[in-house]
Amino acid sequence: MLQPKRTKYRKQQKGRVTGVATRGHRIAFGSFAIKSLEGGWITARQIEAARIAMTRAMKREGQVWIRVFPDKPITQKPAEVRMGKGKGAPEYWVACIKPGTILFESGGVSIETAQESLRLAAQKLPFKTKFIVRPDYVAS
């Protein structure tokens, strides 16, 4: 599972996901990608599930790039604990995703294989996504 090796602070405030992505919104590494159409949080487990779905569908050929990293700790109090007594312990990690962010990229495979593998990955994610192709892509 993805998580930071060390952080300056153990806990963070919730915050809001506002606006659209101005960084990480173009294909940088591969020829194909999935782009988020909605904002929200994606957990480290969801990223890992999508990565496994992609690599299985691609049958270990080509390459996969994960463009998001879960760097925000989400805290939770234990079950049946009264309110108060401070904030809960960090439970899992999320990445804050704005609309337009590139989530996963792939390359080195045919467009049909890439489309199918990214479709399977998109099913594991908590928001709507879109399959995109690099503008200068030429099928070989």
Curated annotation (Swiss-Prot):
- Residue spans making up a coiled coil are none
Q: Name one GO cellular component term.
A: cytosolic large ribosomal subunit
A Gene Ontology biological process term: translation
Which InterPro entries does the entry mention? Ribosomal_uL16, Ribosomal_uL16_bact-type, Ribosomal_uL16_CS, Ribosomal_uL16_dom, Ribosomal_uL16_sf
Role summary:
Binds 23S rRNA and is also seen to make contacts with the A and possibly P site tRNAs.
HAMAP family documented for this protein: Ribosomal_uL16
This chain's protein is named Large ribosomal subunit protein uL16
Q: Which gene encodes it?
A: rplP
